[in-house]
């Protein structure tokens, strides 16, 4: 995220580092700006990054390298994509990040940093008779103001990408929730957003030459006619395990 100048997680990561330094390593404490600059300058495999910030049980691992009981690693998304190509009308194309082994220990020995249980836990693909690919997402916990817009955008993009590499037409993205909430420190921001006149949606276009899900790069995704209102800043609610 830092490499792509996405800084929505900066403050929380720095606060954990700062607390650790105050308690155990004061000589290496630094200001937030210096901390982020160091993260950006370091390799993802450096000791500084890997020993402190590697998230063993986070979304990507569960979806692309989910550990099985026999020691294998299962690429759930990769398998689903292959099955969609081979037998598109089956009803079992589910990808789940919810692993009971980690539900009550997400912040314990498996992770170097605290991580709450997965919020968007399960998604499923289904193909209609007219060869449209639909995507359904179940999200157990939903921060309506800050995170749900990111979830809508990212899973809609995933639908477009998977449809392209499986030779299907993109259909509908259906988003369901278990617990939907607005945090009390977001009330003013939500009121401001509700006072604004909605604008037309932008359009996403993908590089048609991409045939493999792992070959997509940032420049292969084109956003057209994006005309947003000014950004509304809000703090991330610090409620672990929510």
What are these model-derived regions, one by one?
Residues 1-242:
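Terminal, non-catalytic protein-protein interaction segments that mediate quaternary/complex assembly
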